[in-house]
Amino acid sequence: MSSRPLTIGLVAGETSGDILGAGLIRALKEKVPGARFVGVAGPRMQAEGCEAWYEMEELAVMGIVEVLGRLPRLLKIRRDLTQRFSELQPDVFVGIDAPDFNITLEGNLKQHGINTIHYVSPSVWAWRQKRVFKIGKATNLVLAFLPFEKAFYDRFNVPCRFIGHTMADAMPLHPDKMTARATLGIAPDAHCLALLPGSRGAEVEMLSADFLNTAVLLRQHFPDLEIVVPLVNSKRREQFERIKSSVAPDLRVHLLDGQAREAMIASDAALLASGTAALECMLAKCPMVVGYRMKPFTFWLAQRLVKTPWVSLPNLLAGRELVTELLQTDCTPDKLAAALLPLFADTDKMAELRTTFVDLHQQIRCNADEQAAQAVLELVTPR
C-alpha cells in the first residue's frame, strides 16, 4: 500500500457544481480526514481544502455560440488537466456537472487507469440522448439527483446511483418566511419579489434588463413591493448595477451578496433564470416564473434538440407544468409581469402549489453528500 493520502481529483465548472463539490469534500473528509483534493474548484470547494489548478470561472461558459469563442482556451485547459491527472494518478476522479468539458476528460483519464465518476447526470434524457453511450464508456459511475434519471441509465446498462440532491437535505420542508424577512430587513406585511438573473455573466447580461423592467411594472400594482436581488459574486453585482443604472436607475432594490436562499424564502414570488435556481426556489416553497433568453442561434438549435416539454426542474420532477416558463421572444416584461401577478395572491391554488413543492422536496431528500462520498470510496482501488 502507498503511504500517500487518499487523493481525489475534481473539476467543477460553475457555481452549482462548486456547491455540490464542497459538500462532497466535507463528507469525504469526515470519512478520510487526511484526504487530498485537487483540480478545478470554485471558492466553496477551495474553502473546504481543494487545491485549485485552475479557477472555476475559466469553465463557466454558456451556450454553443459563446463556447466557440473560448474553445481554444478550454481545449488547452483540458489537455493540461489530462496530463497532470494522468501523472498524479488520483484514486478517483469526479467530474462535477460541466458535461461537455468533463465527460471527454473523464474518458481520457479512464484510459489512463483512473476510476471516474460523473456527478451529476447531464440532461441526456432531454436532449442529445446518444451521449449516454459516451458517458458509459467514459465513466465508472454516474451520480444522479433526479429519480427518473437512474431509470433512463438503467435502460442502457450504464451504472448510475440516485443520491437525491444536497439542497433538499440542507433546506427545511417548511421554511420560516418571517425569519428570512427579518434577516434581510423586509417588512413582514410587504409584498416581496426576488429577481435572480443567473450566475453566469452571459445570463446576467441577457436577462437583467427584462427582469428589472418587469419589477417596474409590478411596483405599479404593489407600491410597497420590496425587490431583493441576490448575486453570486462581486463581478455579477457590478455587472447588474451597470445594467440597472441604464435601465431602471430609480428602481429601489436590495442587492444581496449571495443569500439567494434567504431571498427566495422571504419572497412571495420569484423571477429567475432556469437551472439549479429553479430547484432551490421550489425547495424554498416560493412560487416562481422562469424567464430565459439565449443568443438566437443557440435557441434555434436548442429547440430542435430538446426532447422534453419543459426546461425547469420543478416541472420536470412533477411531470407537469407547475411553473410558468417564458423563453426567448416570450421573455418580455409584459408577459413576465402578467405571469407573476397571480403568484402574489393568497389563494387555495398557491397553497396547493406549495404543498406540491413539499411533496417533491421529500422525493429528493436522500442525504446526498453522504451517498456521494460512499460512492466515491467504493471506487477506490487499493494501491
UniProtKB/Swiss-Prot annotation:
It comes from Pectobacterium atrosepticum (strain SCRI 1043 / ATCC BAA-672) (Erwinia carotovora subsp. atroseptica). The keyword Lipid biosynthesis applies. This is Lipid-A-disaccharide synthase. InterPro entries: Glyco_trans_19 (IPR003835). It catalyses: 2-N,3-O-bis[(3R)-3-hydroxytetradecanoyl]-alpha-D-glucosaminyl 1-phosphate + UDP-2-N,3-O-bis[(3R)-3-hydroxytetradecanoyl]-alpha-D-glucosamine = lipid A disaccharide (E. coli) + UDP + H(+); a lipid X + a UDP-2-N,3-O-bis[(3R)-3-hydroxyacyl]-alpha-D-glucosamine = a lipid A disaccharide + UDP + H(+). One of its GO terms (biological process) is lipid A biosynthetic process. Belongs to the LpxB family. Pathway: Glycolipid biosynthesis; lipid IV(A) biosynthesis; lipid IV(A) from (3R)-3-hydroxytetradecanoyl-[acyl-carrier-protein] and UDP-N-acetyl-alpha-D-glucosamine: step 5/6. One of its GO terms (molecular function) is phospholipid binding. The keyword Glycosyltransferase applies. Signal peptide: none annotated. Keywords: Glycosyltransferase, Lipid A biosynthesis, Lipid biosynthesis, Lipid metabolism, Transferase. It holds the Pfam family LpxB.
